[in-house]
Curated annotation (Swiss-Prot):
One of its GO terms (cellular component) is cytosol. Sn-glycerol 3-phosphate binds at residues 105, 133, 135, 188, 241, 251-253. GO terms for biological process: carbohydrate metabolic process; glycerol-3-phosphate biosynthetic process; glycerol-3-phosphate catabolic process; glycerophospholipid metabolic process; phospholipid biosynthetic process. It comes from the Bacteria. It is found in: Cytoplasm. It comes from Acidovorax ebreus (strain TPSY). This is Glycerol-3-phosphate dehydrogenase [NAD(P)+].
Amino acid sequence: MKIVVLGAGAWGTALAISAAAHAACHEVQLWARDAQQAQAMQAKRQNQRYLPGLAFPPGLHVASGDMAALAADADLVVVGTPMAALRGMLERLDGCAAPIAWLCKGFEAGTGLMAHEVCAQVAPRLHSGVFSGPSFAQEVATAQPTAMVAASPRATVRDALVQAFHGPALRVYASEDIVGVEVGGAVKNVLAIATGLCDGLQLGMNARAALITRGLAEMTRLGLALGARPETFMGLSGLGDLVLTATGDLSRNRRVGLLLAEGRTLAQAVESLGHVAEGVYSARTVVQRARAVGVEMPIAECVVALLDGELRAAETVARLMEREPTVERH
């Protein structure tokens, strides 16, 4: 099976390593936008910038240049770029015959569209889906046990992802609910900022549990309003990804919350990370999409107010705690 992974960041590299390591019959091409970066990775057999010290398996090769030509000869194409770059990538892949799956999580800034909605706009002929779930790149690359979800309305896409990645260290489940999986991936990043803030302010385990639970309710309400299945949010791409991103210190979104709790500005927090924290860029869009369908998301609203400088860290908590009493709704 020939697998092409577009994007040589931490996550794209990790999945390329995973695919090449667990099946010797796989030929894996990792595409890097920068030709010098590609040459350096191919020569040194590692990604020193994002996953230093992790050697590439023999079946993994690094390329650059014409990505559409590379994809044209693939059995599966995986797009490992951030949400902001997805539209441009899909436009260049329009007409590709191979199944295509993206890894990004969030709603598109400006349009508020989910990834599959962007694909329907710019490349409707593609057989596409999303590969998501509770997974840190470092742990996937080092073959620590992980479970993920391959979601697509097309069985060909789901089956290709299972064939490419299911192995001793990575269990892949299939789902038809691409809406639910994408909503879970977008909202959990925003909620992880809130949980990081909570932990940074040392508000205790009770507060953390409340935030995660009520955050899951917000995620579910939005997902149902957009056509998702309720059971998806109890699975890997919902509750699973939320728990990991909200509590794991490898989470960039959680670290944004921790840094804001220390009194850093948003610009300082983002600069100190050195990598993209999708929740910072998708929070406003999540709230806008929720308002458009009449869904109340008070935690996400407070995160947006914090990121926009309308609230300070302690004020964010006070706003949530001072809301009027109500019945517990999911």
